[in-house]
Amino acid sequence: MFSLSSRFFLYSLCLSAVAVSAAPGLSLSLSGADSVVDVENLNVAATLTNTGDTTLKILNDPSSILSSKFATHTFDISSDNGSPAFTGVKVKYDPNYVVKKNADSSFTVLAPGESVTVNHALGAAYNFTGSGAASYSIEPSSLFYYVDPDTNELASINADTQQHTTKISGTLAVARRSNLGKRISYNGCTSSRQTTLVSAAAAAQTYAQSSYNYLSSHTASTTRYVTWFGPYTSARHSTVLSCFSNMLAYPYANYEYDCTCTESDVYAYVYPSQFGTIYLCGAFWQTTTTGTDSRGGTLIHESSHFTIICGTQDYAYGQSAAKSLASSNPSEAIKNADNYEYFAENNPAQS
């Protein structure tokens, strides 16, 4: 007979074994040609495999390999000569919104041992002119969001990745159209959506002006500033003020708005190096003109990505993550698009 303490020890071991066996795991590998002539032919196949013992419901995040519909910064590419310039899109995407909506098309479900392969055309996202013809290492982003099966809450996991190497020569960049309008214009927008966009542009203009006025008159630490940009320093404050000043220099009534995107989980996207056009997607039309994650706020978010405005990144999505970023890494918070949006929306209001 086992003693009580022995039985408890064995029971604990069993629980530990169950916990270990249920641990999620992913591996990610790339395949493609060993050499490529012209970057328009630079394609890789990314294969994601569930290496754990539990089924994973993974979000089709546009910044992960599970989505190839947007030319996002999904890969780290480097050579002895350096790295190519990223010339693709920055997308406003909220994982919490996607989990709450819970549409089947928003997820990829992988049972243990199951794999999925997604093809990516990298020439649409990277310009190799500066780094030149060379042998390049390509490594995919390892971060994935999934729905925790125990809590139904958003969780994240990093996959074990394998890189791919290829030689690139020939034409090193894909040409892309640029637009810098002098008045508001539309592409593929119904009259109803044009009316909605006039209101959204006006809201964004008000947000930008109010934010600039606030920052100009508050040159010390405030609750609102600290919440979204972290501990106050004059240098970081100057950076944020400059970004809102640049937004005012390019009024939202002068942009081209493109309504041809049909992705329901995405709010909007832009090509940061191609100033002038903001592409609006499904989630944009489902939100409100003002308030949290609003249409006006989305235009603040997207315009901040433009290189000539602020050149922001997408280090964190959503209010909770943006607040955490401000606290833990203010240097990234002042370069994160959602932090500018939430500061401008100021909802709930802070002084």
Curated annotation (Swiss-Prot):
pH dependence of function: Optimum pH is 7-7.5. Active from pH 5.25 to pH 9.
UniProt-listed Enzyme Commission number(s): 3.4.24.20
Keyword Signal: yes
Site (Transition state stabilizer): 317
Cofactor note: Binds 1 zinc ion per subunit.
Enzyme category, top tier: hydrolase
Signal peptide location: 1-22
SMART domains per the UniProt record, alphabetical: Aspzincin_M35
Catalytic residues, chain numbering: 302
Catalytic activity: Preferential cleavage in proteins: -Xaa-|-Lys- (in which Xaa may be Pro)
Propeptide residues per the UniProt entry: 23-183
Cofactor(s) in the UniProt record: Zn(2+)
Pfam families membership: Aspzincin_M35
Superkingdom per UniProt: Eukaryota
Disulfide bonds: 189-259, 261-281
Location within or outside the cell: Secreted
Entry's Gene Ontology molecular function annotations: metal ion binding; metalloendopeptidase activity
Coiled-coil annotated residue ranges, if any: none
GO cellular component terms, semicolon-separated: extracellular region
InterPro entries: Fungal_M35_metalloproteases, Lys_MEP, M35_peptidyl-Lys, MetalloPept_cat_dom_sf
Similarity-based family: Belongs to the peptidase M35 family.
Name listed for the protein in its UniProt record: Peptidyl-Lys metalloendopeptidase
